[in-house]
Amino acid sequence: MEGTTNKDIGSGSSRPGGEVSVSDEIQRRFMEKKWVWAPSSKEAYVCGFVVKEEGDVLEIDCRGVIVRHKSCEVFRMNPPKFDMVDDLAELSYLNEPGVLHNLRRRYQNGRIYTYSGLFLLAINPYKDLRIYGEKDARKYTLSKKYELEPHIFAVANEAYRLMLSNRENQSILITGESGAGKTENTKRVVEFLAMVGGCKGMEVSIDRQIIDANPILEAFGNAQTVKNDNSSRFGKFIKIKFNGGNICGAHIEKYLLEKSRVTSQNRNERNYHIFYQLLGCDDQMLKKQLFLDGEPKDYRFLKDSRFKIPDVDDAKEFRSLRESMRVLGIGEEEQIGYFKIVSAILHLGNIEFREKDGAAEIANLDVAEKACKLLSIPLAEFIKRLIHPVIKAGNEYVAHSRSREQALKIVDGLSRILYDKMFEGVIDRINMSLDSPHKGNFIGVLDIAGFEIFEKNSFEQLCINYTNEKLQQFFNHHMFILEQEVYRQENIEWDFIDFGLDLQPTIDLIEKSNPIGILSYLDEECVMPMATEKTFLGKLMKNIRDEKFEVDKIRDAFVLNHYAGDVEYTVDDWLSKNKDSHSEALTSLIRASGSELVSRLSLNEEAVKKGFFRTVSQKHKEQLASLMSELRRTNPHFVRCIIPNLEKSGEHLDNGIVLGQLKCNGVLEGIRISRQGFPSRMGHREFVQRYRIMMKEKILVDESWDEGVCMELYKEIGGKILSEIGISTSQYRLGRTKVFFRQGVLADIEDMRDVKVSEVVKEIQALIRRRLAFRKYNQAQRRMQGILVIQRNGRICCDLQRWNWWRLYLKIKPLLDVRKRDGEMKEKEAMIQEYARMLDAEKSRREEVEDMLKAMSLKRELLEKSVEDEKRFSMEKDELLMALRYKSDETAQELEKARKEVFDGHEERKMWETRVNEVAIQLEEKDSEILRLRREVSEQKGALSQQEKEICSLREEVVSKLSEKDAMVEKMLRERDSEVQALKEKVKEKDAEVERILEGMKRMEREGEERNRMLKENESTIDELRTRCLNMKRWKDEYAELREDYEALQKKLKDEVEDMQVENDRLHNEIRKISKEREELGRMQKKLLDDLEFERNRGSKLEKAFQELRGEYEAVEGQLQKERQFRDSTQESLLEKTRGLERRVKSLNEKLRREEMANRQLMSEKDEMYREIHVLQQSKLDEIFDREAGFNSIKKNLQMEIQRLEMENQRLSVDLMEAKCMGEASEESISATERFCGMLEEERKKRKEIEYQASEHENRNVILSSEVEMLREMVEMERRSKEEVIRGHEKETGLCKAIAGVRKEVEDLGNEIDMAIEGFNGMYLNVLDGYKRDLKECKEQVMSKEQVIEELNGRIVRLGREVEERKEIEEEMSRKVHGLMKQYNGVMNDFSLLSTKCSSLERTVSEKEEEIKGYSERCSEYDKRFEGLVCRVDEEIENLRRSDEERRRCVEKLESGLNGSIAGIRKLDERYKARIEECAQSVLDGERRKLKAMEELCEQLSKKLGELEEEHQGLLDEKMKGLLRIEQLEGELCAFRESEVHRQDMISMYESEISTLKRCTRFKDEVLGSLSGERNPVVVHVSDKEKCQVLDRKRMTVEHELARANDERQSLMAINKKLREEVEKLRGEIDAGRSKMLEMKKKLGCQSLAVGHLSRELEEEREMVRFFRTLGGARKKKV
């Protein structure tokens, strides 16, 4: 069942109310059986269906296993539509397995948030779901809580919105176990509120400070646990304050810090993060200052913990911590103060004790001394108060000794309280930074541990569970009060029930003081002498009599009944934990610390009255009471976080773990409380719109009705719907704005709606199926008509393919472009040679610059070494001074200590006096030594000043030398510029494209000059050297990037050149294809026009027939059924005719085969006669050639005669249509226009394609230009930064006098400056070495590239040799071709010998010569007419060129007018054809004996035809106007054919069209002859309709072709120009040396292409030879 009800509906879409739309099949399968949830030991619950019911026992099939359970142990399963609902309160059956199943489905689909009544459940995903971005946050700010998916942002936005609208404080309570995601959700809430209410324009905004407070809290308050790598070990309540809608401040309160973690942790856990971050930081000076020289394993408080967290860098986190402190205004000194306390705690833990005479003694005083120095307390006093404390006994103070164990406990207690107070101090400091004087509303975020039930629960768990008990009581009270308030506002009858005291007995049992509760008894035992945990447990057992409390004597524990279950608490160490004991003597010592920060840690103890003792439980109760009072003054929002599993895996949920947390969080209880009344609700308008389909009567509801005005009307309609579907009034309530339902009622209504919708859907499906059937039938009819048209077009295409002249044209056309390509190849080779010369010059210049750089780097290294020696010497002196100062400090401390001891006793005075004298002598000696050292220091300072002067002189010398080098380099660069300018002038004369490349190179050179000049000017000071080092590093990266860009551009340019070559070939092929299609379309157009003329003639004949059939109109109406039958018979007759034509084609094929057999026989006879006529070969050669010419002329004259006969046939058909001459002329012009329009459209398409390619190239150019611009901006930024450094240096020179006044401050900062310079020198040397290595690598690469170039030159030479060899082979092949021609002549001689035996043919030829002369005269007339046509076309081309501007203005008007005319003509033709077809069908279905009766019908039809003819004539006039405009468009197209090549192409196209028309005319005559016996007008008009449709389609195709051809011609020049510009830009950015390699590769590619062209030409010549052979065979056959 789970597979059917869960997985199948997982893809359903959400519906109102939270349901998921499921298929009818899934719903039906669910309804067939009674599905339930049965308990399981492994999975908690499994799904199954009831097989059998036996009283109270059910047999359930759980995945094929039959189990038996009582009815009270199983739970009903929710329908599939409620899977993955957003709110658990919407479930039809509320139970543990139902809630668990819904949460599991949502978790598996990445939905970790789910509403549960009025609060939000959040399950830890253990992975990044990318649902917390700024885009997601913005989406939730624009929506209300329940409009989008459940999310923590929705809760935060709801709180923010209510705060602004109601002016009421809000709170968000986030609870859950450790590792459930509380801290992460708290961070998300704070980030969301900071984004929504952040202020702009401030230097450090308050929202940024609030966000940066989190790393500080995590460092000092978070630690790694078994369940969580970043677990918060304290509770916090963050109040974010708002002034209006903007954040103005914040305040943080902390609860229940886990102090025991400071001194001990579990094996797989860590201490607080700050300890590991300090030990792992990179700041060695700081660690030295804190005396931290070890690793975590070297410290007692850390050695038993885990040292590292996977994927966490402690050093990086420490840097982030210090940055956050800086943002919050915590200064450097204050930061070090906090770090000193943390370090002191580590050192306190490392103090070792040993037993001596029954008392403890410190074994490692140095560690204790470090801790005391960090805390600024005296070591002796610390040891005294730790080991030998003074206790007041009566009026006297008695000193006693502590044992080793006691001392360790005191140290651990001191460490815990130090950390606790320090953490409080950190939070107070954060609050001081985030404080605001504005008083406004706030949003509080509570992050506190959730309810905990462990195997062993102690005092900490009681405090946590007590806190959650109070929060749960607060939740119950708030939630149900709010729910009942909604009922009151909606005017629903309701008896108010107070649920606020449900948990009060347990709370009183813990906290109440009268009668005494558990915590009160604990406080009482803490102040009683000799009290233990057993006495505490005995008091509880004796005095507490409550059903919620139970004592376990065996295990020293008691059981307490909480809202989430019974919890057993063990009382081990409760007294010590509640006392939180520590040494008052040590606390007072810390209060007297010399460090202000340390002394402030215990100031709060001074405010406590003497003798007043406050336990941990009392403090916690006070804090919790304050928190609860704070929450009661706010409007709360609840978030419960849940751990899915213990493996930290985001793949599955552990049912047992999740159920346990649901119980602890009180999820089910909360849902049940929210469902006591009417949990399901829906607005009246929404309810009516969704469920009005269930009404029997139609309800007219206008969507534009205002909901507020028509609320009563919606309410009334909703009541009618509920009463009509049979819902009892006890199951719902009609409120003022909403309708409320009991549990499960809305699910039942939804089921009824699904049934109704399924019925309606079935009716709709039936209608759709009927419509689809009709559509399918109509498509079959149209498909049959299309098949007929395709058959006819296919036959015409086959005829064209068999035409020999067309084949010859296709073979010869590619040979015309070979000569152009040779010229282009020569130009490219010249460019390659020029670039090679430029590359050589650039290489020589580069080598000179590299030599200069080497010399400069050597001098710089010497200077740096000298500076480094001086710095080392000064550092040694400073260290010596520090040692002397340290000794003097120690001496002073000893002196002070001695002076104090003098006044302690009279008996030791003499001894101390002698010791004082000794010390005085030592002091004098040390004073003298100090004076001596001071003199040495002064001498060293003098030497240091002298060395500084020397360094200044050395710097000046370096600057002068560098300036000389600059001048030399500039001179070389000027010479280089002059050479470049000369090269530019030469290249400019040859090619403008190369000039642009050289200009780009010149710009790059100027930029390089400026960069070098700026760099050398800034090397005068140490700061300039540092800037130079950084710039060199950045330039190194830029060089690497430019090198990568160059390689990418090189590859890209190569690919583009190859693509251009391929594209060029493709364009040539497309041009040939277009010309072929254009000729084919022209022939088809002519044929269609002729067919149309023929059919119009047939139409005129039909008009006469209609006059004879006038009286049969009424009788025809009764013959409709017969007409259908006759239509079918007509189709059958057409099919029979088609079969007859196919048989005729077969017969022609048979005839062709017989002719081929005869040809073979003749060839065999020719071979036999070859030996006989060999003697007569030379004598008859001339005669045979003459006769061959005669035969060709006869053949040509015969063809011309056929054409003349065809033209005469056309004239006769035109004479028959004298009344429609104008119409025919207009139609001819239309066809011509359509042909040119098609050509125009084709040109437009090609132009678009080429423009698209051009746009791609432009995009590439834009990208490259942007990269160049970026590099220029980087150079400009470097220039500005260096100018600023220069200005700063000038200011520094002006401040030299002030430097003398602050010489002492400079000496104090000398150490830091020396360290910085030393680090800079090391970094500079490393970068310089890297730069040298890069230069060396560049040289090696240049050498390798030169070798590659030499190898390429060798390959070029070899290829040249191969080309010469191929040329020789070609010449040899040409000689073979000449030999073949000779053989061909021999064959022709054989033909002449064969003709001597065909005397009868010669006589026939002589008889036909006179006829041929007549034909030749007619052909000459046709030639004259054709020449006149060509002249006319040329004149039209000239006229159209002049009208180019006018065409551009009226092209759009012409197209719109043409489209209108075409549409009108097409409509009229369709009407005309439809009517003609109808009449023709009626006539053909009648019998000949009824002709007289149909005369009236024919008269009426003739009248209608006359009217139609008049309408058609009017439309033809409109066509003529459109055609005049189209002729202008045609002329504009011809304007682009300026060259002689294009004019010759047009002439050849016209010739091919004329010949094609003649062939089409002959084919038409044959078809007309075959169909002349048919008298079926229906066939005529059917073909007329089909031909008109084909004509329209062909016209549109020709228009598209014409437009595309025009666009292609216009865009060829543009794309060529753009490609050239792109190549110029690319070449300008590529290094000259590597460009030579690229050009060599291009040259090789061109040569390979040339070889390919030569091979193709050779193959074409072979094809020509074969063609002439076949032509000779044809001639032989004719002879």
UniProtKB/Swiss-Prot annotation:
One of its GO terms (biological process) is actin filament organization. Residues 83-754 form the Myosin motor domain. Cellular myosin that appears to play a role in cytokinesis, cell shape, and specialized functions such as secretion and capping. Belongs to the TRAFAC class myosin-kinesin ATPase superfamily. Myosin family. It comes from the Eukaryota. InterPro entries: Kinesin_motor_dom_sf, Myosin_head_motor_dom-like, Myosin_N, Myosin_S1_N, P-loop_NTPase. Gene3D superfamilies: 1.10.10.820, 1.10.287.1490, 1.20.5.4820, 1.20.58.530, Kinesin motor domain, Myosin S1 fragment, N-terminal, Myosin VI head, motor domain, U50 subdomain. GO terms for cellular component: cytoplasm; membrane; myosin complex. Residues 1-22 are annotated as: Disordered. The lineage of its organism: Eukaryota, Fungi, Fungi incertae sedis, Microsporidia, Unikaryonidae. Residues 624-646 are annotated as: Actin-binding. Disulfide bonds: none annotated. Residues 823-1644 form a coiled coil. ATP binds at residues 176-183. Residues 31-79 form the Myosin N-terminal SH3-like domain. Keywords: Actin-binding, ATP-binding, Coiled coil, Motor protein, Myosin, Nucleotide-binding. This is Probable myosin heavy chain ECU04_1000. It comes from Encephalitozoon cuniculi (strain GB-M1) (Microsporidian parasite). Pfam families: Myosin_head. Residues 1-14 have a biased composition (Polar residues). One of its GO terms (molecular function) is actin filament binding.
